[in-house]
Amino acid sequence: MRTKLTIATHAILTILEIIALVYDIYSFGIAMFSYYTIDSNILQMLVSAGILYCLLKKKEGTIPVWLSKAHLVSAVALTVTFLIAALVLAPQEGFSYYFLENVAPINHFLAPVLSVLSFLFLGIGEKLPKKAVFAPVDATLLYGVIVLLLNAVRVVDGPYFFLKVYETAPSTIVMWFGIIAVLCWVLSAIYCWIRRKNA
């Protein structure tokens, strides 16, 4: 039963993420990769497709540790996307844009919910090592550093206010990096703990 639910959930996620990706390519082109939200959703699409492959094609029908770790990264990243959109960006720029228009319901709500629920309660495969808890932090900081550098050399602008190096005080940038890194670690630790309890 769990395997069937996992397959159904990730099939839905894959379809939703493909729809969102097509729209994002049309809307942003190559610039879409500067968005943490879009990167997180692309990762989830790849993770879900990988899980489907493992469960439908491979004889053992289990998910390898590296793929479960990637799912942890996408689940945490999508949660951060939801929280930042809901608590920081939407109050500044409008709720409708971040949660109701175009593919925003997928990127900011449906994908995060399905990703987290499937990671917590539908995990199949070997247990994650304890050090996996740092994977979402590492991935998020890597994204932040890369986009910050691209802002510094004026290749991209933003896309988030705390990445605009020429408009934001260094202390504000450091503060937001710290807040998001801690948030990623806390979410990751909670998710790993709940997943172990439901294994």
Language-model features: where?
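Alpha-helical transmembrane segments in multipass membrane proteins, preferentially the mid-helix core
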Residues: P112-P129
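Non-cytosolic membrane-interface motifs at loop->transmembrane helix junctions
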Residues: I30-I38, W66-L67, G94-N107, K130-F134, ...
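Membrane-interface loop-to-helix entry segments
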Residues: N102-V113, V174-G178
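Membrane-interface capping segments at transmembrane-helix boundaries
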Residues: K57, A189-A199
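N-terminal membrane topogenic signal
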Residues: M1-I12, N198
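Membrane-interface transmembrane-helix boundary segments in multi-pass integral membrane proteins
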Residues: R154-I190
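Juxtamembrane "helix-exit" motif on the non-cytosolic side of transmembrane helices
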Residues: V22-I30, A86-S96, A152-V153
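Interfacial segments of alpha-helical transmembrane regions
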Residues: G61-A77, P129-D138
